[in-house]
Amino acid sequence: MIATQKHFHRIIVNGKEIGYIQILSYNNSHPQIEYNLDEKYHNTGIMTRELVQYLDTIKNDYKAITAVVKEDNLASIRILIKNGFIQIPFGKAGYKIYLKNL
């Protein structure tokens, strides 16, 4: 499966790129959000705030998006829940899938 990258957003703090958010589409369906943040900035609220703004920017381009997260990545799960994602009953062992209707 080849992913198409869309809506790439760099997270910049004090002139330094510390993370990103993007949408990946597989075969033009099932858009999936992916994000990453430098560990030094974890638990600061930056990703939660950036994701709020990002979702507002893309809301007219998608009906819904998904996120796949390791089930032990509690910080990422909290970010998704704070941004209105709900867990759906699909996924492979060790991972959870979250969905957000836009």
Name each region found by the language model:
Residues M1:
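Conserved GNAT-fold acetyl-CoA-binding loop/helix
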